[in-house]
Amino acid sequence: MEIRQLRYFAVLAEELNFTRAAARLHISQPPLSLQIAQLERELEVRLFDRTNRRVTLTEAGAAFLNDVRATLAGLKDATVRARAVDQGRAGR
């Protein structure tokens, strides 16, 4: 599982549309679909229900989204702290 896949998952969960999510991520739709499919295979969980016109989160996807958001926020905080320490703005 890659951080990129988690970011892609979170954006798709917000947009519920592959085309809009891909545009927001500045990628094309096929790589987004591929990364989401790989994530689902690795987790052995279907995260989204897909139809020709709709994408919806499964119950498992909604539960996973809560943890993914917390994980991504934690990574962002860790990055900010590391940069602050590196620049002498925080304790070591």
Give the residues covered by each predicted segment.
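N-terminal helix-turn-helix
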Residues: I36-R41, G61
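A short LG(V/I)-centered, amphipathic sequence patch enriched
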Residues: E40-L57
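Alpha-helical linker/hinge and terminal dimerization helices associated
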Residues: E42-L43, F64-D86
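The N-cap/first-turn positions of alpha helices
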Residues: E2-Y8, Q29, G61, V68
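Interdomain hinge and pocket-entrance segments immediately C-terminal to HTH DNA-binding domains
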Residues: R53, A84-R92
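Short helix-boundary/capping micro-motifs
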Residues: L12-S28
